[in-house]
Amino acid sequence: GREWVTMFSKENIATFDYVFTDAMTWTDTKGRRMRLWMPEEVFVDDKDDFMDQLVGQIVGVMQDEPIDMYVNSTFLPDILQPEYDTLWTEERMDKVIQAAVANDIAIEINARYQIPSATFIKSAKAAGVKFSMGTNNTDKNLGTLDYAIQMITECGLEPDDFFKVVKK
């Protein structure tokens, strides 16, 4: 959840090589706490309203939390997955991309969920966003980065397009 920021002092956070998070746990405007990967905890009364709230959460995380990488970047709950390309409009993608640029935050290319889309990655690359690769897996597929490798080729990513740890 969002409370992780209060669980560590600023001094402790400053000692980390890097910090990553997502917005997969949040509370909607009706006060309902959601964990987006758990279908029974997701509330979608109106798809566009949900998406606008989700984008607002993502942008808020990028603006307000001391992170280096944003992971599970364009994750949608199961109920919305079939409409991924429709719901992730150019305007919504641009808000997330601009927040990443403004706050110098890398975006994860997630091999497990196969997100973000090539369209998002190409737009983010053009805007100067850096990338990382990850899986969010806890099973035998941990470390399997096939989708990320595919996106490197498809989107023309080069080594300089990737996040690099800077020793503090």
PLM segments and residue spans:
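Charged catalytic cores and adjacent phosphate/nucleic-acid-binding surfaces used
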Residues: Y84-K168
